[in-house]
Amino acid sequence: MTHQTHAYHMVNPSPWPLTGALSALLMTSGLAMWFHFNSTALLMIGLTTNMLTMYQWWRDIIRESTFQGHHTPAVQKGLRYGMILFIISEVLFFTGFFWAFYHSSLAPTPELGGCWPPTGIHPLNPLEVPLLNTSVLLASGVSITWAHHSLMEGDRNHMLQALFITITLGVYFTLLQASEYYEAPFTISDGVYGSTFFVATGFHGLHVIIGSTFLIVCFFRQLKFHFTSNHHFGFEAAAWYWHFVDVVWLFLYVSIYWWG
């Protein structure tokens, strides 16, 4: 047995970054195959390998943090910096989509009819499903904060209730968004309006699904007493991510649905 004289976690070699990258390649290639050739086989393989990677990577992190005690205060500080930088990178990711939208809408070209929305496009009513979606996500922001406060105060039952409500609202948002896509009077192939609308709201929807998955993992961990009032970075990271998703939706709603 070796003894370390520092507070940092020397991670064992792991296959999950490689399998995660390969599954992402399969998913993006599968998406292109689905769009162009109506074949979902590659996409399904990518999704399956991605789910397997996520399950096993999360399992390893839970073992290292909760059961082996490798997540010392110094390690948690590094993880916090990592999560903050990740969220900043996500902000820049969505900035690109907003840039594309405003670039197209503030000075519409003659090909678009010199107006926005382009000629022939019938935009969705912002006071119907989009407003309900906004209410749902804002309510989920309140419930995740309730869960965090309950955890800090050691109130396990209220934490589980609030977390369950947040997950339910996240799933409800996803179903509403799917129904909106199904009923939309335009498609992703309807010029720059369709492209910017579906890519921006679609990537946001993907982030809601990722955030919901993150919260579901936290819910099951809390059922097994993994979190304490002073050792719960996994939940804290999920809450930060959820608030980020919430704020991005507000910008999407104001920009694309209401103004655009």
UniProtKB/Swiss-Prot annotation:
The chain crosses the membrane at residues 16-34, 41-66, 73-105, 129-152, 156-183, 191-223, 233-256. CDD domains: Cyt_c_Oxidase_III. The keyword RNA-binding does not apply. Pfam families: COX3. Residues 1-15, 67-72, 153-155, 224-232 are mitochondrial matrix. It is a multi-pass membrane protein. It is found in: Mitochondrion inner membrane. Keywords: Membrane, Mitochondrion, Mitochondrion inner membrane, Translocase, Transmembrane, Transmembrane helix. The keyword Transmembrane applies. GO terms for cellular component: mitochondrial inner membrane; respiratory chain complex IV. Its EC number is 7.1.1.9. GO terms for biological process: mitochondrial electron transport, cytochrome c to oxygen; respiratory chain complex IV assembly. It catalyses: 4 Fe(II)-[cytochrome c] + O2 + 8 H(+)(in) = 4 Fe(III)-[cytochrome c] + 2 H2O + 4 H(+)(out). Residues 35-40, 106-128, 184-190, 257-260 are mitochondrial intermembrane. PANTHER family: CYTOCHROME C OXIDASE SUBUNIT 3, CYTOCHROME C OXIDASE SUBUNIT III. Component of the cytochrome c oxidase, the last enzyme in the mitochondrial electron transport chain which drives oxidative phosphorylation. The respiratory chain contains 3 multisubunit complexes succinate dehydrogenase (complex II, CII), ubiquinol-cytochrome c oxidoreductase (cytochrome b-c1 complex, complex III, CIII) and cytochrome c oxidase (complex IV, CIV), that cooperate to transfer electrons derived from NADH and succinate to molecular oxygen, creating an electrochemical gradient over the inner membrane that drives transmembrane transport and the ATP synthase. Component of the cytochrome c oxidase (complex IV, CIV), a multisubunit enzyme composed of 14 subunits. The complex is composed of a catalytic core of 3 subunits MT-CO1, MT-CO2 and MT-CO3, encoded in the mitochondrial DNA, and 11 supernumerary subunits COX4I, COX5A, COX5B, COX6A, COX6B, COX6C, COX7A, COX7B, COX7C, COX8 and NDUFA4, which are encoded in the nuclear genome. Belongs to the cytochrome c oxidase subunit 3 family. This is Cytochrome c oxidase subunit 3. It comes from Bos mutus grunniens.
